From Swiss-Prot:
Family, as annotated: Belongs to the glycosyl hydrolase 5 (cellulase A) family.
Further remark: The C-terminal region of C.acetobutylicum is not required for activity.
Protein name: Endoglucanase
Matches recorded under InterPro entries: Glyco_hydro_5, Glyco_hydro_5_CS, Glycoside_hydrolase_SF
Residues annotated as signal peptide: 1-34
Gene Ontology molecular function terms on file: cellulase activity
Catalytic activity: Endohydrolysis of (1->4)-beta-D-glucosidic linkages in cellulose, lichenin and cereal beta-D-glucans
BP GO terms, sorted: cellulose catabolic process
Catalytic residue positions: E175, E263
Species this chain originates from: Clostridium saccharobutylicum
Amino acid sequence: MFSKIKKINFFKKTFSFLIAVVMMLFTVLGTNTYKAEAATTSFGGQLKVVGSQLCDSNGKPIQLKGMSSHGLQWYVNFVNYDSMKFLRDKWGVNVIRAAMYTNEGGYISNPSSQKEKIKKIVQDAIDLNMYVIIDWHILSDNNPNTYKEQAKSFFQEMAEEYGKYSNVIYEICNEPNGGTNWANDIKPYANYIIPAIRAIDPNNIIIVGTSTWSQDVDIAADNPLRYSNIMYTCHFYAGTHTQSLRDKINYAMSKGIAIFVTEWGTSDASGNGGPYLDESQKWVDFMASKNISWTNWALCDKSEASAALKSGSSTTGGWTDSDLTTSGLFVKKSIGGSNTTSQTSAPTFSLQSGTYDSAQTVTLTSSDNDSVIHYTTDGTTPTSSSPVYTSPITISKTTTVKAFTTKTGMTDSNITSAVYTISNTDPVKQVSAPTFSYNQEHTIQLKL
């Protein structure tokens, strides 16, 4: 501020005087500003296993439904932020499985590139508020112990980087086969890998494959693992596997273990032939009756019956029914998706835009149950990576709030905003000048 000079005449007679100075001080008001957490969890929150059921954070049984990728070394281009967002909004998908093969040009021969593909998919799922299965896709290697050291190192790294996110699910061995058995091979492998993950991530779900291409869940049920939040996978293809495999699942669940069908197809076990929609419907109805979560094989345009997309389809979503195969149409309907998905309602602000003379509190609400509000307070456009609204926002200075609503199975709302100007909040402070005594005239300079 500028200096103000004032000449003050003093008479020879000694006297005292008091100078009152009023000045405006710009101060920052209270520092208890609301801090939001990032969007790190899907609609069910922290998953857990209760008895034979996968449950949400409140202990309520939940059924996840979604898509599995094909091998990432071949069809990773179909699994990206845009395609996953489309599946979430248009089909109602809430889980994605990233199938990272060990052999056939997969992780063992190309660890760095395959790991980067997995990381991109996992981060996209987190940003989209979806669950994601990290699949160690053993197949031609038959026995999970073949690469158990690489598996341990890989899952430790995944747990270190993503274990804090409840979106993440670990699948530690896709389809043990070729004479590999539960007691001598798979269970010892699981007892080696699971503690390595649990030392870093104590809570997220771990899924374990079973013998005979993950069909022998009944054998695992008679000799289960002794850890919490463990599930066992059963894989089926409708043209090959029918009631006898459902009987195995019924038995396993009656023994108290939880099942997650991380891979199933409308085709026969080769991935081609069919699709067999009548038997597929029996399976879909069965899984719904048991609250068994599932991911369908496969999100790709490969020329085989189990592929969801026709050859040459877009890799970034936006698919209409004409882009889908017979299998893709069936699976979309089974998940609950529609190409006429409604839009969720925009959030409502408790306080209108305007000028206020003191700090204000703003509440954001949505008329859609189970929806999530993302917002910003710096004037930037909010995205699904922006903070999730969980409690009132304190406005202590001029602020632009922008927000939108998301809900699984619906398209995102329009972005709404409000501008709040806070004025006259700077306190006026009265400062007393010192007392002076002179016996002759002086000039005093006051600096404000």
